[in-house]
Amino acid sequence: MAENQAKKEQVHTVFQNISQKYDRLNNIISFEQHKVWRKHVMSTMNVQKGSKALDVCCGTADWTIALSEAVGSKGQVTGLDFSENMLEVGKQKTASLENIQLVHGDAMNLPFDDNSFDYVTIGFGLRNVPDYLSALKEMHRVLKPGGMVVCLETSQPTLPLFKQIYSLYFKFVMPIFGKMFAKSKEEYEWLQQSTFNFPDKQTLKGLFFEAGFNDIIVRSFTGGVAAMHLGYKENSSSKGD
C-alpha cells in the first residue's frame, strides 16, 4: 500500500511538471507513431454515434478528442486524469467541443456509477497507475454490460530485431530526450522505467481476464513496441445461456 502511494505521488509530480511539454515529448519519443496506432485502434472500435465514452488517464485529451468526433453531437465523452496540469492543457484543446467533460480523478477509484459507459479507453496511461488490476477492475465496473474496453499501451517487442533496437533506444536515446524535456533526473528516469517495466502483451491479457473482461483481442504495432487490448464486459442477458 505504501509502495503504491509512493508511486502515485511520484507519477503525479512527473506529469504536473511535464504537462506543457507532454504533447511534443510524446510525438518525439514515438516518432509520431502513437497517432497512427490510435487511428488503427479507433477503426477497430467502430464507435457508434450517440454513445457514452470514458477516457481514463486522458492526459492532454488527444484520445478524448478522437472519441468526441466518433460519438458525435448526441454522444458524450468524459476524460479523467489525476494531473490537474495535464487537464488544464486538455481543457484548452477541447474548449470548443461541447460533448466533452474533463474530470479530475483517480483511475483506481473512478467517480462514476456502475454500468455508466458504452466504451472505456486508456491510452499510454495504464503503465503509470500503481495497481494495474485495480484500474482494470474499476474500468470494468463503470462499463455497461456488453460495453467495450480498449487499452493502447507500450509493450515488449516480440521480434528479435525490434527487441535489440528497443533495448538500445531505452538505454541511449530516451535519456537524451528525457534530459531535454524533464526538469529532473527523477522525471526522465520514470519515463524510461514505466515503459520498460510494463508487462508484455500476454501478461496484460491475463490481467484483463482477471478483471472480468471477455473476448479479448490483442493486436501488436510496430514489431510489438505497442499493443492494443480490446475486450468486453459480459452482457447480463447472456448469463445463464
UniProtKB/Swiss-Prot annotation:
Organism listed in the record: Staphylococcus epidermidis (strain ATCC 35984 / DSM 28319 / BCRC 17069 / CCUG 31568 / BM 3577 / RP62A)
CDD domains for the chain: AdoMet_MTases
Metabolic or biological pathway: Quinol/quinone metabolism; menaquinone biosynthesis; menaquinol from 1,4-dihydroxy-2-naphthoate: step 2/2
Family named by the database record: Belongs to the class I-like SAM-binding methyltransferase superfamily. MenG/UbiE family.
SUPFAM superfamilies: S-adenosyl-L-methionine-dependent methyltransferases
Keyword Transmembrane helix: no
E.C. number(s) listed in UniProt: 2.1.1.163
GO BP of this protein: menaquinone biosynthetic process; methylation
Lineage: Bacteria, Bacillati, Bacillota, Bacilli, Bacillales
Keyword annotations from UniProtKB, A to Z: Menaquinone biosynthesis, Methyltransferase, S-adenosyl-L-methionine, Transferase
Catalytic activity: a 2-demethylmenaquinol + S-adenosyl-L-methionine = a menaquinol + S-adenosyl-L-homocysteine + H(+)
GO molecular function: demethylmenaquinone methyltransferase activity
Keyword Methyltransferase in annotation: yes
Name by which UniProt lists this protein: Demethylmenaquinone methyltransferase
PANTHER family: 2-METHOXY-6-POLYPRENYL-1,4-BENZOQUINOL METHYLASE, MITOCHONDRIAL, METHYLTRANSFERASE
